[in-house]
Amino acid sequence: VYKRQTLYISVDPYMRGRMTNADSYVQPFKKGEPFNGHIVAKVIQSNAKDYNEGDIVVGMLPWKKINTVSTEHIDKVPSTDVPLDLYLSVLGMPGQTAYHGLLDIGQPKEGETVVVSAASGAVGSVVGQIAKIKGCRVVGIAGGDKKVNYLTKELDFDAGVDYKKDDFAQTLADAVPDGIDVYYENVGGEIGDEVFKHLNTHARIPVCGAISSYNHPEEDIGPRIQGTLIKKQAMMRGFLVAEFADDFKNASEQLAKWVQEGKIKTQVSVEEGFDKVPQAFRNLLTGDNFGKQVIKVSDV
């Protein structure tokens, strides 16, 4: 048992599904109890032999400033030489989601075209950069000039497409003259509908999320994809990152190496204080945030 002080909490799209009683892959939040999610915390008191005062830990824990919990749901961070919020982004669950979804399901090959939606976000930005490391041509879809410019000028994507522009369909077509071999799906809705028109034979589609429909599931009506999957002999597969837990350690080491080498860059949107949680959620679901959304609760 140990007592910890929360430093950062992670705000993630999947949490929207925990705010309803709809059938989902994760239990809904309980009324009258604190949210729980991924946090970075500092140990301030401990009787556990492996955890000392001052240790920095990460885990799935209640959103409280100070809390006494068991050690079964936490891990020490491997290093404090990097910004701690990275353990909620590229060195945490979003990085694992990007890594395994792309490499284990998407299986990109050198020279192929990889398209990723929500490309400036915590998962999408890492997907695109890993695809570049693997020698692929990468096209990112994002909303607004600032995000699209970030993809091409900061992250070295080969092309960026703004889904908010009226000419989105044509711009996307121009960006993928040789078709699409891997589409990493984070958004769903009309964006996915347009991408599916350009799939190559044997395309792979890892489905990580469908954030466009999280607030309005009743409106999520679009073209039927089955015919395209058959015609293109394409593979579309949903996944939960937990299924790859046995390989988390290896993936973490590789991601950390790429970060240290400057091959993966990150963008973090930081709000300060628990009172900013509602606005952070709104920003996340409307696309107004930039990169990984975290809340800073206290200083180290």
Identify the role of each PLM range.
Residues 3-11, 19-63:
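Glycine-rich beta-strand-centered segment in the early N-terminal region that forms part
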Residues 167-178:
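Short amphipathic alpha-helix with an adjacent loop that forms part of the alpha/beta core around
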Residues 35-42, 53-118:
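NAD(P)H dinucleotide-binding glycine-rich loop of Rossmann-like/cofactor-binding domains
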Residues 261-270, 278-300:
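C-terminal capping/lid region of NAD(P)-dependent oxidoreductase domains
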Residues 64-65, 143-153, 168, 220-226:
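Short, glycine/polar-rich helix-capping loops at beta-to-alpha or helix-loop-helix junctions
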Residues 88-166:
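Mid-domain Rossmann-like dinucleotide-binding core that forms the NAD(H)/NADP(H) cofactor-binding site
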Residues 58, 115, 161, 183-184:
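N-terminal Rossmann-like NAD(P) cofactor-binding module of classical short-chain dehydrogenase/reductase
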